[in-house]
């Protein structure tokens, strides 16, 4: 492969892969609103957010986290919409790229299991400049922190210091998290300030000449991050 001074794979190859993702129809029979794969980011991105799956509003608008959950997440991260949606700095992947539908209680169904194994590694190969990955919600955490995890989501998130500086784990920012936030004030009082400080370093940093390839990053024992 030719050497590129930036250390990044040329954009046209990445653009072809994104077009392939957006043309994916593998899960079409299972999607009540039909497929609309949503993925954002460019090879220059330094922050990677891996979350659950698009909700109905996101499916309609084509913009990830374009809903109340997104408002809460941006509040946690202290990012305005302009920065959050700057694909040159922030990449966003769901564990599934299409809206999976809703359950009988009105909540979203789990992400389709076909999506992440098929696409994530291929996409992350191009995100060689990533310095911080956020795992948002149980589906992303369970997938990327492979192997036995603690008995509860709280026991995973409370270990946030163990995952820095390359990885951070968060609950999903849906309305269901409101009670959890009340019961766990340390998250907003201790964890989020540290996360915001790390993000400020990442998003303001000058790009490296040779970013470390993803497969050489070691984030945490048993982690898929860096594979």
Could you describe each region identified by the protein language model?
Residues 2-203:
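A polyanion-binding, active-site-adjacent surface
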